[in-house]
Amino acid sequence: MVPRLKEKYEKEVIPALMEKFQYKNIMEVPKLEKIVINMGVGEAKENQKVLESAVADMQLISGQKPILTRAKKSVANFKIRENMPIGCKVTLRKNKMFEFADKLMNVALPRVRDFRGVSSKSFDGRGNYALGIKEQLIFPEVEYDKIDKVRGMDVIFVTNAKTDEEARELLRFLGMPFAQ
């Protein structure tokens, strides 16, 4: 079954972007390449159980098993050594990516307290958008009673857009609730 957001992209977003940016070829239209969800778990250095529960939460949210991220080098002030596991991340592509984006924009973000829209300034200059989420409870899969600690995560939308303006329009047409 084709995800709802992918269908919307093909039927509505592509024609709208072609008209707005005057593309001559359908292959010029920017598209979502992947979504990377990253969770840094600072307490993992003392307690491995914390990391396991973070991995379990992320697996529920993304529907895919996360990989552990490790420290690149030792930092004495943070009490970490090289190669210590300090977080986890998931890279979503194709249908899982569209399903996650749909769930994030239409279910999870509206559940954030005092939500007025996401910042439209978080583009990196190359058409990628980063979004910070303060708590994993906004996702319907995570049950309040089952979590040990409220954890945040970063969600990065990687597009093949050439400019931030193109990427912003792509995400806006897909339904990203940008603050006015």
UniProtKB/Swiss-Prot annotation:
| The protein's assembly and partners | Part of the 50S ribosomal subunit; part of the 5S rRNA/L5/L18/L25 subcomplex. Contacts the 5S rRNA and the P site tRNA. Forms a bridge to the 30S subunit in the 70S ribosome.
Q: Does the keyword RNA-binding apply?
A: yes
Q: Where does this protein come from, organism-wise?
A: Clostridium acetobutylicum (strain ATCC 824 / DSM 792 / JCM 1419 / IAM 19013 / LMG 5710 / NBRC 13948 / NRRL B-527 / VKM B-1787 / 2291 / W)
GO CC, any one term: ribosome
| Record's protein name | Large ribosomal subunit protein uL5
* Record function comment: This is one of the proteins that bind and probably mediate the attachment of the 5S RNA into the large ribosomal subunit, where it forms part of the central protuberance. In the 70S ribosome it contacts protein S13 of the 30S subunit (bridge B1b), connecting the 2 subunits; this bridge is implicated in subunit movement. Contacts the P site tRNA; the 5S rRNA and some of its associated proteins might help stabilize positioning of ribosome-bound tRNAs.
Indicate the family of this protein: Belongs to the universal ribosomal protein uL5 family.
Keyword hit for NAD: no
Looking up HAMAP family in the UniProt record yields: Ribosomal_uL5_B
Query: Which InterPro entries has this protein been placed in?
Result: Ribosomal_uL5 (IPR002132), Ribosomal_uL5_bac-type (IPR020930), Ribosomal_uL5_C (IPR031309), Ribosomal_uL5_CS (IPR020929), Ribosomal_uL5_dom_sf (IPR022803), Ribosomal_uL5_N (IPR031310)
Q: Which UniProt keywords apply?
A: Ribonucleoprotein, Ribosomal protein, RNA-binding, rRNA-binding, tRNA-binding
- Which Gene Ontology molecular function entries are recorded, alphabetically? rRNA binding; structural constituent of ribosome; tRNA binding
Q: Which Pfam families match?
A: Ribosomal_L5, Ribosomal_L5_C
Q: Which GO terms describe its biological process?
A: translation
Name the domain of life.
Bacteria
